[in-house]
């Protein structure tokens, strides 16, 4: 368990439930335009997970990027959303979204997302390659005082 996550916030239990719920879908296949539960695209997966806890996010990663409050990379917490450019839309246009599940003492993190090639998987960040080059920013959707 991350001590960092619980310090100064009441939402630790909610975040843990969110992470546990998301992890139940590891291995679920990717399908463009799908919002679960048998297949997901990236924004469909994030929307599905958050909706289960009463947070209604818009359907696309590019519109989800305009929700919540901006978070600096060094301040990432479990439950935060990370946004990346897509394959074909240029480096500044959001085309992919993931949710932070763990933050390590060195500032690296692990996120869960629906990958086009692997379905729902965990991914370390920074990865020294694909996701590091495409990272755009992060947002916090869940308020510090949100309860489970």
Specify the residue positions occupied by each region the protein language model found.
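Glycine-rich phosphate-binding loop
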Residues: 81
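Soluble non-cytosolic domains of exported or imported proteins
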Residues: 9-16, 36-41, 70, 129
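Catalytic cysteine-centered active-site loop
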Residues: 24, 28-78, 89
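Intrinsically disordered, low-complexity
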Residues: 1-28, 108, 141-148
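Aromatic- and glycine-rich peptidoglycan recognition patches
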Residues: 94-148
């Amino acid at each position: 368990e991350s001590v960092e996550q619980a310090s100064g916030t009441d939402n630790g239990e909610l975040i843990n439930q969110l992470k546990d719920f998301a992890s139940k879908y590891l291995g679920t296949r990717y399908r463009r335009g799908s919002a679960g539960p048998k297949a997901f695209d990236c924004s469909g997966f994030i929307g599905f997970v958050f909706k289960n806890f009463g947070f209604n996010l818009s359907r696309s990663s590019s519109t989800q990027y305009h929700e919540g409050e901006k978070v600096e990379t060094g301040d990432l917490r479990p439950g935060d959303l990370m946004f990346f450019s897509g394959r074909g839309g240029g480096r500044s246009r959001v085309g992919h979204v993931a949710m932070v599940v763990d933050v390590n003492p060195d500032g690296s993190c692990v996120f869960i997302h629906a990958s086009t090639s692997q379905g729902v998987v965990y991914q370390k960040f920074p990865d020294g390659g694909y996701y590091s080059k495409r990272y755009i920013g992060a947002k916090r959707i869940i308020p510090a005082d949100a309860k489970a």
